[in-house]
Amino acid sequence: MMEEVGTAGNNLGATEIDHDEQNTFLRICRTGSIYELMEVTPFFGGDRHLLHRYDRHGRQCIHTVAWHDRANAVMKIEILMQSGVNINAKELGTGNTLLHIAASTGNYLLADWFCQQLGVDLGASNNQQETAYYIAYKMRDRKMMKLLRAHGVAYNNTLSAGLL
């Protein structure tokens, strides 16, 4: 049985939402409960366009979950994966993956979970040619760097640039 960790609690304050984003699905991804997400996913059926649609920030639903609901990100993303979401999807504007977002937000649980998934690109670079490891390095997040190294994330580019 899944147990919800808590509310989104992102401390970001109010955000402006496009009219096309004022739908139940994206609200649930952003701040809804795990149970709400479980209730709506069976209604996707053969039409999974919401899973792959980008919002005005260039984010798909999995990116929205990772940025806005750190406490429940892993459980929500697992539910979305069962519905057919692409775990390797990148944000349009930044090219960030879930691992980049986890490194940027200090979400160790999400980073650890992501690194254990099959078929993920642990060395993906975003549009600024930054890896998740490099983001952790820039933020001086030694705990994230250690976690990523433990999962075999390559940090050779950082080392060769004298940044380790």
Swiss-Prot record:
Domain of life the protein comes from: Viruses
InterPro entries documented for this protein: Ankyrin_rpt (IPR002110), Ankyrin_rpt-contain_sf (IPR036770)
Pfam families: Ank_2 (PF12796)
GO biological process: symbiont-mediated suppression of host NF-kappaB cascade
Keywords: ANK repeat, Host-virus interaction, Inhibition of host NF-kappa-B by virus, Repeat
Record-stated family: Belongs to the polydnaviridae I-Kappa-B-like protein family.
Name of the featured protein: I-Kappa-B like protein F1
Organism: Microplitis demolitor bracovirus (isolate Webb) (MdBV)
